[in-house]
């Protein structure tokens, strides 16, 4: 059986806790994807994969389900710093071609979210595709205790 995603949705979240692992769990909870066994995959959006809302995507998943995603994650405990995690997506004009998702994370700077979009767009262009549209989602937070930012493109098979 081929595991080709039919749909994708985008989420982001921030978590804070004295323990780094718990801050990650809280970031997943803030994003709404803490109830799944998340498996990281690389950057391909299959041809015909439809973008759906977070709410629609979550309705199609079950607690404990193995779920594939492209995730950006960044954690810090350096108080006062501002961190981020972004995923950017680029979709081709030609519906028979694949799109791309790019992860980008670190300490916040102006243009960070746009950089994630540009990365995905550049990967799409290198396959000779024209870009129909781009999208990005970002989690951003000021560090207090351990702080984790996550952004993810979550696939529905």
Swiss-Prot record:
A GO MF term: arginine decarboxylase activity
Pyruvic acid (Ser) PTM positions: 43
Keywords carried by this UniProt record: Decarboxylase, Lyase, Pyruvate
InterPro entries listed in its UniProt record: Pyr-dep_his/arg-deCO2ase, Pyr-dep_his/arg-deCO2ase_sand, Pyruvoyl-dep_arg_deCO2ase
Site positions per UniProt: Cleavage (non-hydrolytic): 42-43
Cofactors that this protein relies on: pyruvate
UniProt superkingdom: Archaea
Catalyzed reactions per annotation: L-arginine + H(+) = agmatine + CO2
EC number: 4.1.1.19
GO biological process entries: arginine catabolic process
Cofactor note as given: Binds 1 pyruvoyl group covalently per subunit.
Family under the similarity heading: Belongs to the PdaD family.
PANTHER family, alphabetized: PYRUVOYL-DEPENDENT ARGININE DECARBOXYLASE
The protein, known as: Pyruvoyl-dependent arginine decarboxylase 2
Gene that produces this protein: pdaD2
